[in-house]
Amino acid sequence: MSITLNSGYEMPSVGFGCWKVDKATCADTIYNAIKVGYRLFDGAEDYGNEKEVGEGINRALDEGLVARDELFVVSKLWNSFHDPKNVEKALDRTLSDLKVDYLDLFLIHFPIAFKFVPFEEKYPPGFYCGDGDKFIYEGVPIIDTWRALEKMVEKGKIRSIGISNFPGALIQDLLRGAKIKPAVLQIEHHPYLQQPRLIEYVQSQGIAITAYSSFGPQSFVELNHPRVKDVKPLFEHDVIKSVAEKANKTPAQVLLRWATQRGLAVIPKSNNPDRLLSNLKVNDFDLSQEDFKEISKLDIELRFNNPWDWDKIPTFV
């Protein structure tokens, strides 16, 4: 199953998320994911594993397991590279690390511009802005970064461009000035954080949505996120367990199907070959309206990935 983007390209509705994939096993994991049928790989400069993702992709390409035009390779422009003069530089680094000639989709990771950090000083820079732990920002409006991305589409280095972690008001503002409409919005989305009005607005604008952290707190356990302790893991929630039992599916499959049934794409990750396959097979069944509604009642607007926690950045306030 795929979603037709407003750029005319097809995006698989289930992909493999590269966030937190260990560098030591990453190349093998990506290669194995291609072997079992994954075609979309969602990465980012900030994940620090693009070279390894590229190794896995290129091993599969070299062996003829898949052709480049059958893959949908995604990356994200990090906060430190928003200045238009640094956008192409950052994109070229990503293309070089992945060893691909173009990206299928390149997203602005966050609507936040940090001070530029030269690659030789630290790459990926993460939250480092050149002065210890201090956050230093650059006065770069989103539309300026967007214009630079539009040029990269014109140059053939990117097929589709999009945004990630953007609230509705910023999306509306971007649409007023964009020559090329965002093809995709990527958001944190799970039963504890459903964002129905944002989804309704974005879909009404012809923009596709990819959900990350579909398993909710599960995605943030290893980061020792304080809010993880506030809620029951979704895999153990009675509603999810009961729906999974009824459908003869795993809780993970139910959570992923609940999202794809809303018209969203999903990007789960797993290092386990069996789970890799079962996560991919989530569009061969439907949740009943009743089960769908029961899961939808779990919304408590609980956001785990919030820039307010970094430095009181008001992205979602």
UniProtKB/Swiss-Prot annotation:
EC number: 1.1.1.307
SUPFAM superfamilies: NAD(P)-linked oxidoreductase
Functional pathway: Carbohydrate metabolism; D-xylose degradation
Residues annotated for substrate binding in this entry: H109
Disulphide-bonded residues: none
Top-rank lineage group of the source organism: Eukaryota
Record-linked InterPro entries: AKR (IPR020471), AKR2B1 (IPR044486), Aldo/ket_reductase_CS (IPR018170), NADP_OxRdtase_dom (IPR023210), NADP_OxRdtase_dom_sf (IPR036812)
Binding residues annotated for NADP(+), in chain numbering: 164-165, 213-222, 269-279
Keyword annotations of the record: Carbohydrate metabolism, NADP, Oxidoreductase, Xylose metabolism
Lowers pKa of active site Tyr, annotated site positions: K76
Function comment: Reduces D-xylose into xylitol. Preferentially utilizes NADPH as a cosubstrate.
Protein name: NADPH-dependent D-xylose reductase
Species the sequence originates in: Meyerozyma guilliermondii (strain ATCC 6260 / CBS 566 / DSM 6381 / JCM 1539 / NBRC 10279 / NRRL Y-324) (Yeast)
